Amino acid sequence: MKKLKVAIVGSGNIGTDLMIKILRHGQHLEMGALVGIDPDSDGLARAARLGVATTAEGVEGLARLPGFGEIDFVFDATSAAAHVKNDPFLRGLRPGLRLIDLTPAAVGPYCVPVVNLEQNLREPNVNMVTCGGQATIPMVAAVSRVARVHYAEIVASIASRSAGPGTRANIDEFTETTSKAIEAIGGARKGKAIIVLNPAEPPLIMRDTVYVLSAPADQARVEASLAEMAQAVQGYVPGYRLKQRVQFDEIPDAAPLNIPGLGRLSGLKTSVFLEVEGAAHYLPAYAGNLDIMTSAALATAERMAQSMLNA
């Protein structure tokens, strides 16, 4: 079966884990190159041992590799600031490249596979939001398909040890991009995102809490929609699960909640508690936050590649 070649820009935790996933499980994709800026990085050393072409000279080095002309997909696992420069540079050389953006740059449309992948199959650049967004936006969208969502707030708690320099450099972009995507894809009128780097030792796996305030709705229908969505996410992130039963609170008109920017609102408050365990391909199992990003990005590119090969 013909496979499309990919390059991964960023040889840190996310880029290296993504490379391992493609090497082990790529169905329509195969590795073409791993790109970094640190010649001593573990990711580049590992890639070289596995027979993958490497460069420590960034996207300029990628463009000079003999196989650059055969690359169909580029995964960018650098930083938001770097991606804003990488996209026009690469597209200037190869206009037809597909870029999968794993930074919070959001040059292209947000993509959460279980919610809106099919709408984005032909996009030249898609943004994978953030780890917190990939974990929680499906839950907001699950409530949205049952009732109108006024407000959604998510809290993503990740092990401090799983947050590399790229994640730490993008904390502000994380909250901004996730909040916007909660609205754009999740369907909330207003979204808010909070990230917590948990320093506990031994490290704890990723935990996410989702609070949704919606119009009044049938609780059984909401719970069923959430369970169905969680199962869909498990299709590409097996370690994704509801940690406990969904909790509901009816907010009466007589005692509404005051939501900044929206005013006083009543309705149904839904609380969802998630945990995400990583597949431990390259990263430890507690780094579910990184695993859900690489898994979502791979699922997106695989579906795009399938569509391109079948065209």
Curated annotation (Swiss-Prot):
InterPro entries (alphabetical): Acetaldehyde_dehydrogenase, Acetylaldehyde_DH_C, NAD(P)-bd_dom_sf, Semialdehyde_DH_NAD-bd
Pfam families named among the record's database cross-references: AcetDehyd-dimer, Semialdhyde_dh
Keyword Flavoprotein assigned: no
SMART domains from the UniProt entry: Semialdhyde_dh (SM00859)
Highest taxon of the lineage: Bacteria
Reactions accelerated catalytically: acetaldehyde + NAD(+) + CoA = acetyl-CoA + NADH + H(+)
Disulfide topology: none
Enzyme class label: oxidoreductase
Entry's transmembrane regions: none
Residues bound to NAD(+): 11-14, 162-170, 289
Annotated keywords: Aromatic hydrocarbons catabolism, NAD, Oxidoreductase
One GO term (biological process): catabolic process
GO MF assignments: acetaldehyde dehydrogenase (acetylating) activity; NAD binding
Catalytic site: 131 (acyl-thioester intermediate)
EC number: 1.2.1.10
Similarity comment: Belongs to the acetaldehyde dehydrogenase family.
Protein name: Acetaldehyde dehydrogenase 2
Taxonomic source organism: Azotobacter vinelandii (strain DJ / ATCC BAA-1303)
Gene this chain is encoded by: mhpF
